Amino acid sequence: MGSSQKWVIGLLLFSSIFFELTAITLADDKLEESRWGNDNGCGFGRRGCGGGRFGGRGPSFGRGRGAGGGFGGGAGGGAGGGLGGGGGLGGGGGAGGGGGLGGGGGAGGGFGGGAGGGAGGGLGGGGGLGGGGGGGAGGGGGVGGGAGSGGGFGAGGGVGGGAGAGGGVGGGGGFGGGGGGGVGGGSGHGGGFGAGGGVGGGAGGGLGGGVGGGGGGGSGGGGGIGGGSGHGGGFGAGGGVGGGVGGGAAGGGGGGGGGGGGGGGGLGGGSGHGGGFGAGGGVGGGAAGGVGGGGGFGGGGGGGVGGGSGHGGGFGAGGGVGGGAGGGLGGGGGAGGGGGIGGGHGGGFGVGVGIGIGVGVGAGAGHGVGVGSGSGSGGGGNGR
């Protein structure tokens, strides 16, 4: 055999071996790809693979578990894993889920949002120091906490009134603004139910009289703006049921008498100008009179601006049953004796006569009775 034939046979043998090995290698690659469905040679969850159908471990920045894997694979892989913690945009975490850039609760919504809110409460808006819960401008507390200026149920009067945390000293209920008292405390101008008068009048009168500003109640009640009683109008303003108690303590020392402007007391002294039913008179008259200047039973409203009887109009104004008693300690003599400065001027039944008149036309029981009854610098039985 020649040398040329040997070369041909050797070349054919080498070529067959080379092509056989090449075919085997290429076939293996194709088979592997068709079996695992992956260009990277990854199997089920094999390490180093990025986002198979069942969530392998991420190959990119964060490797970490589930970086875009799971059902959100594909786009979630790579960078989403490392930074996102819980996964990529499509995974459990990411910007939208529990993890994301913020981790933990994170900025993400969904379930992560809820948990984040709770923890964020505390010092924040959820309550505590921040307001929200206990406080709030409209709540029981207020911006500053405690009771505060907050409105709503219990602000001032109402249920909060009784206890009077805001009362007495402050303004709240009970003794405060909304309750028996007024703006300044004990009595005063306070509005609302029992503001001065009404139910609050009774008790308010006794204690709040003499010393305090408002007497029995507030502007509408037994007490008034100035002294023991005051100007308070309305039913029971000074007089009425509240008069009795209010008169006693408030009468003696204080300015006002049994009631307010419409009641036993007046602007200045024991009784006053008050007209209307029971103005100075009534049950409250007795206590309000005596020392304070008003007559025994309130002589025509307890008296006028100055003394015992006075200008009081309406039933029993000036004279009447209170005429005689109007003398008493404060009547009879002096400018205000028996009547007020305008004593006897009052019209109606039982009109007082003259200045300081002790005796009046149509005088009731005790007419002309008292220390100065029947005397005084004024004389005559003539009224103007």
Swiss-Prot record:
GO CC annotations, alphabetized: extracellular region
Keyword check for Cell wall biogenesis/degradation: yes
Signal peptide location: 1-27
Example GO BP: cell wall organization
Keyword Glycosyltransferase among record annotations: no
Subcellular location per the Swiss-Prot or TrEMBL entry: Secreted, Cell wall
Keywords: Cell wall, Cell wall biogenesis/degradation, Repeat, Secreted, Signal
Main location: secreted
Additional note from the record: This protein contains 67% glycine residues.
Function of the molecule: Responsible for plasticity of the cell wall.
Protein name: Glycine-rich cell wall structural protein 1
